[in-house]
Amino acid sequence: MSEIKFYLVKGSALFGESHYPEKRKFVKIVRALNEKQAIEYIYSYFGSKNKIKRYNIKIEQISEIKEEEIPDRRIRELAKIDKIIM
């Protein structure tokens, strides 16, 4: 069974393509099994939240990071959770 890893994804996207196009850079931490799934998550995230087409998202760098290297404390704490009881 594969282990879930953390990926740091850097890139740029074209926001507001139809009205006033603006190219913005982004940095996002993603949990995925491999790089391919991390890239797919980025495309689906920006597509659903901001209505950005895949061809307007340019991924410049993707790198695997360790759990200790994650800058956001909330993400580190969520990564330690084994199960959720509802």
UniProtKB/Swiss-Prot annotation:
This is Large ribosomal subunit protein eL20. GO terms for cellular component: ribonucleoprotein complex; ribosome. HAMAP family: Ribosomal_eL20. It comes from Saccharolobus islandicus (strain L.S.2.15 / Lassen #1) (Sulfolobus islandicus). The gene is rpl18a. Pfam families: Ribosomal_L18A (PF01775). Part of the 50S ribosomal subunit. Binds 23S rRNA. Keywords: Ribonucleoprotein, Ribosomal protein, RNA-binding, rRNA-binding. GO terms for biological process: translation. The keyword rRNA-binding applies. SUPFAM superfamilies: RplX-like.
